[in-house]
Amino acid sequence: MRKVLALILAGGHGKRLGVLTEKIAKPAVPFGGKYRLIDFTLSNCVNSGIYHVGVLTQYRPHLLNNHINIGRPWDLDRKKGGVTILPPYLGGVAGWYRGTANAVYQNIEYVDSADPDFVLILSGDHVYAMDYNDIIDFHILKGAEGTIACIEVPPEETNRFGIMMTDLDSRIVDFEEKPQRARSNLASLGIYVFNWKFLKEYLIRDEQNNESTHDFGHDIIPLMINEGCQIYAFKFNGYWRDVGTVRSYWESNLELTRPIPPLNLYDRHWRFFTQTEEMPPAYCAPTSKIVNSIISEGCEIYGFVENSVIFQGVYIGENAVVKNSVVMTSTKIGENCVITDAVIAERVIVENRVIIGEGDDAKNKLDSDVYTGQITVIGMYSVIPSGSVIGKNCVVGVGVEKGDFKTQKVESGDYILHKE
């Protein structure tokens, strides 16, 4: 019987999500009405029969640690195996993880104690459904030393991924991380299977190389391929999304509201599990109207909701209109509000008669590289005062208070941050 250990890299900042990851790690970002991003990778593990999982955390880990806890929602609260949180070792000569490969290197003793045949290395911030047995079976069939899951991406997106070229037998003959000019459109998903003894040797060598960035895509994998190792590409044909930008995060959530969504959250044979607060069923008042939307438990809806994802415990007041938006847990939207093309984070208070997301297209003044999709983003714990008008592609930072608003109107592309 093969022994597989999964290692989930969950220490990422997710800077391209802007204020959504200012206080939490990217894998802890809410998604799909009740989940957090890491839930999809954890659920894929247990649905694939993998019950020995290490989660490597670093950036703002507290909420993520509390969310995973002992792993009970995923049936990972086990005496043998189960889930283990693996923060950086800050004593002795070690320190913060200096790259994806270094993160695994710092946990060599943990992996050795599990004595696996194969190590499955995963990212904790992607949304997808995958039976990992498929890639492991492929890996064994090919007699591979390492296998990388991949998909074909549009040519204009190749500079966001590790890009590989293969021979007719799917063996990888060239690999380049985020090339400016790609010779292929076959992109790595950041999902790897390695024979453990083989990988361990390369991790030790990489750690001794002072010129290395200690990253799988930049250093480890290119070295393996250049030295003629048996590294293969496993083509994945299912749903997979990198929700690393505000626009892709917003789009991927709203995809779930389609009549036939690309990711089926309701598949009884492939459930996604999460740790959530117990809440009563949603209530939709006689004054409410809901069209093509996800409404989670604990919500109270008195207004109009269309093409939106509404998380747990959200309150939407009478005559309020919410369209094409993502509204996260325990946010309150007052009466007579109009919210369009927005992402509103957790525990925000939007007072009465507020308009969000309407206006002309405009370049964002805070960070035009991060806020590019004409989506208005409201950070967690903020309060939007009555009568405010917030335009398109605006940003309201984390914890913004009424006193931070110097005027009722925030022009498209502008921003408001909390002043200490």
Curated annotation (Swiss-Prot):
Pathway: Glycan biosynthesis; glycogen biosynthesis. The gene is glgC. Alpha-D-glucose 1-phosphate binds at residues 97, 162, 177-178, 188. It comes from Pseudothermotoga lettingae (strain ATCC BAA-301 / DSM 14385 / NBRC 107922 / TMO). InterPro entries: ADP-Glc_PPase, ADP_Glu_pyroP_CS, GlgC_bac, GlmU/GlgC-like_hexapep, NTP_transferase_dom, Nucleotide-diphossugar_trans, Trimer_LpxA-like_sf. This is Glucose-1-phosphate adenylyltransferase. It is an enzyme of class 2 (transferase). It comes from the Bacteria. Keywords: ATP-binding, Carbohydrate metabolism, Glycogen biosynthesis, Glycogen metabolism, Nucleotide-binding, Nucleotidyltransferase, Transferase. Its EC number is 2.7.7.27. Pfam families: Hexapep_GlmU, NTP_transferase.
